[in-house]
Amino acid sequence: MAKGKDVRLVITLECTNCSQNPNKRFSGISRYTTSKNRRNTTNRLELKKFCPQCSVHTIHKEIKK
């Protein structure tokens, strides 16, 4: 049986460049879902991932649900 809250959280990462870029291929904002360990990573997660709307690798930041 598990005690307390789960350590792993499911989070959403959103592209920081999509809202500022007028030369996008598609409309919308790129979002990825992933999980993080609450004990090891307490601050907000930032990863460099590919954005299909911008067609480049950009920084994706964790957003609130």
UniProtKB/Swiss-Prot annotation:
Signal sequence segment: none
A biological process term (GO) from this entry: translation
Domain of life: Eukaryota
Disulfide bonds: none
Annotated localization: Plastid, Chloroplast
UniProt GO molecular function: structural constituent of ribosome
Keywords associated with the record: Chloroplast, Plastid, Ribonucleoprotein, Ribosomal protein
Matching InterPro entries: Ribosomal_bL33, Ribosomal_bL33_CS, Ribosomal_bL33_sf, Ribosomal_zn-bd
One Pfam family it belongs to: Ribosomal_L33
GO CC annotations, alphabetized: chloroplast; ribonucleoprotein complex; ribosome
Gene3D superfamilies, per the entry: Ribosomal protein L33
Family to which the UniProt record says this protein belongs: Belongs to the bacterial ribosomal protein bL33 family.
Entry-linked PANTHER family: 50S RIBOSOMAL PROTEIN L33, CHLOROPLASTIC (PTHR43168), LARGE RIBOSOMAL SUBUNIT PROTEIN BL33C (PTHR43168:SF2)
Name of the featured protein: Large ribosomal subunit protein bL33c
Annotated organism of origin: Chaetosphaeridium globosum (Charophycean green alga)
Lineage: Eukaryota, Viridiplantae, Streptophyta, Coleochaetophyceae, Coleochaetales
